[in-house]
UniProtKB/Swiss-Prot annotation:
It comes from Schizosaccharomyces pombe (strain 972 / ATCC 24843). Keywords: Cytoplasm, Iron, Nucleus, Oxidoreductase, Vitamin C. GO terms for cellular component: chromatin; cytosol; mitochondrial matrix; nucleus. This is Uncharacterized protein P8A3.02c. Belongs to the iron/ascorbate-dependent oxidoreductase family. One of its GO terms (biological process) is cellular response to hypoxia.
Amino acid sequence: MLYENMSDSFLLSDAGLEFDEALLEVDQEKDDYLDDFENWTVVPVETIEGINYYPNCLPESVQRNLINNVPKELLSIYGSGKQSHLYIPFPAHINCLNDYIPSDFKQRLWKGQDAEAIIMQVYNPGDGIIPHKDLEMFGDGVAIFSFLSNTTMIFTHPELKLKSKIRLEKGSLLLMSGTARYDWFHEIPFRAGDWVMNDGEEKWVSRSQRLSVTMRRIIENHVFG
């Protein structure tokens, strides 16, 4: 499904198109396992196999160019959880993000190809996303770029009762594959800020509006409907 511009994609994603509806489910899949975190073990995020994090991955010029070309309705402060779904070919200011995904990641997981499906998600202060794993219609390998501000992502492994967290900074890239993609749940808590370690102690940091760009490949021969 091809769109001439991002505005078309944003408007059509609310129209109930089958492919878009399937993609919407990606960020709404959840198992009711989180009764509480008591007796869970906190582990460093670096110990989770399949997670790679690149702070300051994107130049400021690339970040500004993308934000300047995002439809105003997507970045509106009114309403929560707004998404824009894009499929190849992407506009140039978005397609260039493929250049910042490590080539060995693409070679190993995407057969050397670029992403072919993107979800742009806006988070206003207080917004979040429930614990979930990506749908099986997506192949291994997820790339998440962060724009505008920072947030904290939580990882949980209910079978092993393990939990972890990572600070996703503006301009950063988070890669998930293998164990991190298939065995761990990830979420962004619904709250107005995050506890962040600073000078040896945790301090509450209020959130600002954030835009995430999540890039994936679709499993070959996947059929909708």
